[in-house]
Regions:
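Glycine-rich, proline-tolerant flexible connector loops at the mouths of alpha/beta enzymes
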Residues: 31, 35-51
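Histidine-acidic metal/acid-base catalytic patches
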Residues: 1-28, 52, 80-83, 117, ...
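Aromatic-lined substrate-binding rim segments of carbohydrate-active enzymes
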Residues: 44-62, 74
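Conserved beta-strand positions in the central sheet of alpha/beta enzyme cores
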Residues: 5, 35, 60-62, 88, ...
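Active-site acidic/histidine proton-transfer and metal-coordination neighborhood
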Residues: 24, 33, 65-153, 160-162, ...
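Active-site beta-loop-alpha junctions enriched in small/polar residues
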Residues: 9-11, 37-39, 62-66, 92-94, ...
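Active-site mouth loops of central-metabolism enzymes
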Residues: 5-17, 61-69, 96-101
Length: 247
């Protein structure tokens, strides 16, 4: 059964003010797990103990390419302490947004994946829309990166649609290779802005069914920008997502 998590980047402003209070609220809203986007200076052992007491699991850690390249042993220790089994690279800098840049990045990601695998951790890449705008060796840069050894996908439904792709169609070749999915809606207007799940233009039902059948472990709510209080936005998203999943 695919679980429901939240990407804590969504709640970054709230977490800066009340890190542990936000974790409590996330649990109260019904999230089973979180996807970490930094610990805001809190000791990892303290965070792990607090999350464990709440019963909040760790879906994954988002870790920058710089950290993967420069301090991967610390990343491994952090993941193990938090009880996470997956590490995700969330973004690559603009300097890499060219065919040669993506070729270099894939080598770095493959090296990180190999080191993480030896430590019992799986690796995924999270994309935006820019990887769909560049072609590498006859396919999009995203598809090129996902062809790398040891690189699973964290596919983001909003960014697939923003990049001009049909999310459900794009998913089809990746059955069994999308353990993490960012469930994110797009406003049904010309602005194509971020929206709470179930309030926009994305048809989630067939996508969620595909994920459940295709081995997705976590449906992860994320909203890069919220119109008001981000906790209110994720509350709407999880309520609608649970209805879609009959949870």
């Amino acid at each position: 059964m695919t679980g429901i998590a939240v990407q804590l980047y969504t709640l970054r402003n709230e977490m800066e003010q009340d890190f542990y209070g936000v974790l409590e609220k996330v649990k109260e809203l019904g999230f089973e797990a979180v996807e970490w986007a930094g610990l805001y200076g809190h000791p990892v052992a303290e965070v792990a103990a607090f999350a464990g007491k709440l019963g909040l699991k760790s879906a994954a850690l988002h870790v920058s390419l710089d950290r993967l390249n420069g301090e991967i042993e610390a990343v491994i220790a952090e993941a193990h302490a938090l009880g996470a089994t997956r590490v995700v690279c969330p973004y690559v800098d603009q300097k890499y947004h060219s065919p040669d840049g993506y070729r270099a990045v894939r080598k770095e990601l493959e090296a990180a994946a190999k080191t993480l695998s030896a430590a019992g951790l799986a690796f995924s890449y999270h994309h935006h829309d820019f990887e769909l705008a560049t072609e590498v060796d006859g396919r999009s840069a995203l598809e090129y990166l996902l062809d790398g050894d040891g690189i699973s996908a964290e596919l983001d439904l909003y960014w697939l649609k923003k990049g001009g792709r049909d999310p459900l169609a794009f998913l089809q070749p990746y059955a069994g290779r999308v353990p993490l999915m960012h469930v994110k809606d797009m406003s049904d207007d010309a602005a194509q802005s971020f929206a709470e799940v179930g309030t926009g233009s994305i048809d989630f039902a067939p996508i969620l069914a595909w994920g459940q059948a295709g081995g997705t472990e976590w449906f992860i709510v994320e909203q890069d920008v919220c119109p008001g209080n981000a906790l209110d936005s994720v509350a709407i998203s999880i309520a609608n997502l649970r209805k879609l999943l009959n949870k």
